[in-house]
């Protein structure tokens, strides 16, 4: 059996130590990468669940904008509301150009209401329903035709139901943009 010289033995031991260190590093890197992948996956699930909660009515099902510390939100300094978009929702890629100016006016007022810090979704939706139903009453007075009123009421009901069932996320997003909470920074929308 050949004996290695002292320098060769030292070199061999250094090489073996380097190999062991590389293997440990590879295991550590894989372990860290696995944890990072798991963390990113959990974060994505959390993001999707929060979006679903916003869409379906918020945490309590009531669709209310609240500060996490329980304080009342206040208007964001210098906030400029976005221009109203008529009847539609960019969230769902829907824009309804119905061609009835008074209907578009109701939708625009509703958008502005959602962007008024501290205004409840319920109050905005009730004002919207009143505005829409007034259009149908005016159609009845002007035309006196029942079939036009029924078509108007069907359109109003469809719009209002859409707002009630799908309007939570747009409301919460508008409140987040228009309001500020003490001790909180604005988060990305």
UniProtKB/Swiss-Prot annotation:
Please classify the protein's predominant subcellular localization into one broad category.
secreted
Chemical reaction(s) catalysed = a 1,2-diacyl-sn-glycero-3-phosphocholine + H2O = a 1-acyl-sn-glycero-3-phosphocholine + a fatty acid + H(+)
Q: Give coiled-coil spans as residue ranges.
A: none
Which Gene3D superfamilies would you find in this protein's record?
Answer: Phospholipase A2 domain
Tell me which residues this entry annotates as catalytic: 110, 125
- From the UniProt record, which GO molecular function terms apply? calcium ion binding; calcium-dependent phospholipase A2 activity; phospholipase A2 activity
Instruction: Write the signal peptide boundaries.
Output: 1-22
InterPro entries linked to this entry: PLA2G12, PLipase_A2_dom_sf, PLipase_A2_His_AS
Tissue specificity statement from the Swiss-Prot or TrEMBL entry: Abundantly expressed in heart, skeletal muscle, kidney, liver and pancreas.
Q: What class of enzyme is it?
A: hydrolase
Give the record's keywords alphabetically. Calcium, Cytoplasm, Hydrolase, Lipid degradation, Lipid metabolism, Metal-binding, Secreted, Signal
In short, the EC number is 3.1.1.4
Q: Which residues bind Ca(2+)?
A: 88, 90, 92, 111
BP terms from Gene Ontology = arachidonate secretion; lipid catabolic process; phospholipid metabolic process
Kindly list the places in or outside the cell where this protein is found, as annotated in its UniProt entry. Secreted; Cytoplasm
Obligatory cofactor(s): Ca(2+)
Entry similarity comment: Belongs to the phospholipase A2 family.
Q: What is the recorded name of this protein?
A: Group XIIA secretory phospholipase A2
């Amino acid at each position: 059996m050949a004996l290695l010289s002292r320098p060769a033995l030292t070199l061999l031991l250094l090489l073996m130590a380097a190999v062991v260190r590389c293997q440990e590093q590879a295991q550590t890197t894989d372990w860290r990468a696995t944890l990072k992948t798991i963390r990113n996956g959990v974060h994505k699930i959390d993001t999707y669940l929060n979006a679903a909660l916003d869409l379906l009515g918020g945490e309590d099902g009531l669709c209310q904008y609240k500060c996490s510390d329980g304080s009342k939100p206040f208007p964001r300094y210098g906030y400029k509301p976005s221009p109203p978009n008529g009847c539609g929702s960019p969230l769902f890629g829907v824009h309804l150009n119905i061609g009835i100016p008074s209907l578009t006016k109701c939708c625009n007022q509703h958008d502005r209401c959602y962007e008024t810090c501290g205004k409840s979704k319920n109050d905005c939706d009730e004002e919207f329903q009143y505005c829409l139903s007034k259009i149908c009453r005016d159609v009845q007075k002007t035309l006196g035709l029942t079939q036009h009123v029924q078509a108007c009421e069907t359109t109003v009901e469809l719009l209002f139901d859409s707002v009630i069932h799908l309007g939570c996320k747009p409301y919460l997003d508008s409140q987040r943009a228009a309001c500020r909470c003490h001790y909180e920074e604005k988060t990305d929308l």
